[in-house]
């Protein structure tokens, strides 16, 4: 547990150091016209926006958005920077800029550490007075508020989400006269029926490599129907007996029998390959893979389809809490009203349509969700229904814990040990619960 503690405290300490050096070159005594984004003058106002992990096609979108801002607001010039590389590269660049006082007005990587340390502006007042606020998904807004220790502050305006789903080979199911399974019992029956080892064909593929813990968490809670990660006494629910039962079926009984042996080390890339090349009947991922799935199967939905997770033991579908994300405003920005105009323009129907189709995300804006691509593209329609909460319950995934992803990383080796028979499901989940409880207790002590 010392590892989790050290990671948590180090992250919070570094965040404090970063904010300590943050001036952003700001001058809060600038003119009222500048504070209002030049709303009442012809003065040109510059707003800076850094976007994370921008590829060539994404850069084209952001270049278009910069032009669109000036088209709608002639007095606002958007200084748009698409940062290539990984999310870690972006975070390193941003942290250095914060310390140097050169951080941008808008960022699109929402982090709880920067909420707690005051880097982000609280957007509650802006949002409450925004005429289009009712178009934005309540579930996404509430999810973003979990990054505030009080649960009340909105520090990023959500622009979309990538719900998780079950990718299915519907043509394989047709061969055994089955529909897409809507219960876990049917799912486990189907993977057995679909498996033909002599043909190197398996009912499903398990993500045993990088990212395994994140996927497994979602599936366990989907199976059990539990929607809270902690009880009233701060005890973790991840080691609930229903989760032990699921791991027995999924990691022990299915692995090696209805899955390939090399699933032990598969990351998403290998999982997608197994599904698309006809070696696995089911895989679990998010809608970000929708475009590659559609291309691999040439948009032939008689061969593949997205589906919600099967119903839980309680008779309803459980989806992980939607990941907090959105556009945040630098609390040291000199032109906050202009910044807000840019942020809300990003949430407009036209921009949301373009963004959602490019990134494979369901828009936060309901008008954009009602457009053709999101209503008539099979996998996006599934995601849209999830975001709108149709027959879905969301659990309270603790994304707000600074060490949450570190706990997941620690568990990946233990998951492989369980698949290999060197650890029992009970041992895995008890250790997982202990780490989560420690992370929560330390967070609450720090937050209070």
Per-region residue spans from a language model:
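Short, low-complexity disordered leader/linker segments with a strong preference
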Residues: 1-48, 71, 430, 434-448
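Extracytoplasmic/periplasmic substrate-recognition and gating elements
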Residues: 67-72, 77, 152-153, 175-176, ...
């Amino acid at each position: 547990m010392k590892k989790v503690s050290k990671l948590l405290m180090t992250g919070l300490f570094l965040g404090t150091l970063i904010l300590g050096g943050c001036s952003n070159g700001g001058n809060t005594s600038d003119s009222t016209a500048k504070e209002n984004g030049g709303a009442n003058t012809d003065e040109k106002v510059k707003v800076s926006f850094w976007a994370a992990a921008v590829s060539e096609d994404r850069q084209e979108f952001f270049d278009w958005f910069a032009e669109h801002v000036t088209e709608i607001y002639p007095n606002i010039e958007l200084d748009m920077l698409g940062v290539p590389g990984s999310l870690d590269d972006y975070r390193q660049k941003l942290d250095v800029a914060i310390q140097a006082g050169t951080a941008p007005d808008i960022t699109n990587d929402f982090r709880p550490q920067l909420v707690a340390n005051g880097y982000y502006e609280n957007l509650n007042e802006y949002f409450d007075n925004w005429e289009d606020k009712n178009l934005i998904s309540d579930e996404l807004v509430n999810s973003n508020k979990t990054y505030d220790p009080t649960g009340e502050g909105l520090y990023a305006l959500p622009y979309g989400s990538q719900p998780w789903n079950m990718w299915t080979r519907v043509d394989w199911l047709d061969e055994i006269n089955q529909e897409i399974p809507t219960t876990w019992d049917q799912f486990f029956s189907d993977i057995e029926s679909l498996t033909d080892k002599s043909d190197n064909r398996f009912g499903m593929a398990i993500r045993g490599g990088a990212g395994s813990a994140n996927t497994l968490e979602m599936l366990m809670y989907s199976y059990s129907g539990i929607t809270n990660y902690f009880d009233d006494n701060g005890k973790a629910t991840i080691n609930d007996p229903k989760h032990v039962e699921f791991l027995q079926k999924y990691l022990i009984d299915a692995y090696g029998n209805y899955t390939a042996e090399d699933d032990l080390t598969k990351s998403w890339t290998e999982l997608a390959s197994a599904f698309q090349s006809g070696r696995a009947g089911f895989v679990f991922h998010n809608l970000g893979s929708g475009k590659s799935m559609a291309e691999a199967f040439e948009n032939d939905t008689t061969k593949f389809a997205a589906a919600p997770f099967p119903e839980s033991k309680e008779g309803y579908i459980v989806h992980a809490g939607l990941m907090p994300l959105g556009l945040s405003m630098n609390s040291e920005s000199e032109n906050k009203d202009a910044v807000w105009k840019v942020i809300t323009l990003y949430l407009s129907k036209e921009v949301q349509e373009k963004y959602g189709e490019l990134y494979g995300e369901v828009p936060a804006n309901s008008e954009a969700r009602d457009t053709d691509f999101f209503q008539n593209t099979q996998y996006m329609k599934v995601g849209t229904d999830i975001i709108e909460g149709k027959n879905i319950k969301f659990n309270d995934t603790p994304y707000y814990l600074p060490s949450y992803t570190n706990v997941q990383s620690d568990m990946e080796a233990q998951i492989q040990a369980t698949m290999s028979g060197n650890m029992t499901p009970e041992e895995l989940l008890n250790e997982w619960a202990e780490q989560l409880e420690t992370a929560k207790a330390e967070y609450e002590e720090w937050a209070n």
